[in-house]
Amino acid sequence: MSVSILVVDDEPDVVDLFGQRFRREARQGTYVMHFAASGVEALDRLAEKIQPAIVAVLSDINMPGTDGLELLGEIKQRRPDLPVMTVTAYGDDERRRRARELGAFEFITKPVDFDRLKEQLRQLPTAAD
């Protein structure tokens, strides 16, 4: 059964990297990857009735406009059950604390350990259903 993952990042290279690192899972039908370049675009994507349903959001923190922490707060207000993993090159304690307060499921620092990330995604209750 396929599930959708929404990746939010304003850097095209990062989007390409996620596409490459999840290529096998996409071919196997495990994950359908969706991408948004901003927090506003991510909220628009979440409002759509995407099938298969989005079961997790992976969001960069440092983005112009609505940053990843603001996006996290908005998502948690609208869909408190949706796991959001923040992804950032800045792993400082303040960002980590703020992400946790806002309800982040996981705080991931770059460079991303994709094997670990895939394992975390497999552990999501909605991904196994």
PLM regions and their residue ranges:
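Two-component/phosphorelay signaling modules centered on CheY-like receiver
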Residues: 12-34
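Receiver (REC) domain active-site loop signature in two-component systems and cognate sites
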Residues: 63
